Amino acid sequence: MQLLLSLLFSFTLEQPQSEIPKNGTYIYEVAFAEWSGRTMGDEVIVMLKDGHITLKVSKNSNILWMGAASGDVIEEGTLRKHQSGVWIISNDEKDVSLEEIGGCTGGPTVIDFDKQTIEMC
């Protein structure tokens, strides 16, 4: 019985993400937190170099970045693994212990390397 409960509980938890991809430039989609993480085709340029990340406006971006031009920096920081197992864009080592992250919380941005998404509000 205890084994069965452990198995059921483990499937309900969000699984930790894979490791950071190699240095390079990638195109990710925006996952909108206020719409349950749905993507709407809005692209972001993701530049990774030695644990540092820079997000830039893609030329294929929608109206999300009103007033921003293609190539403008949206956000940058250090990649850190949050205590929950997800990767965050952080500028403070203490961010890994924050209760609220990502989306519309005002906390660090969540990046999902497996789904190739950036969670934003």
Language model region names:
Residues M1-L7:
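Sec-dependent signal peptide recognition
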Residues L3, G107, E119-C121:
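Residue-level signal for functionally critical sites in structured catalytic/ligand-binding pockets
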Residues L3, P16, K81-S84:
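Positively charged, low-complexity intrinsically disordered regions
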Residues F9, L13-M40, K115-E119:
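Tryptophan-anchored aromatic micro-motifs
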Residues F32-R38, L48-T105, K115:
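Contiguous, well-ordered beta-strand patches that form the walls/edges
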Residues D42-V44:
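Periodic aromatic/glycine/histidine/acidic cluster detector
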Residues I111-F113:
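Acidic/polar residues at beta-strand termini and the immediately following turn/coil
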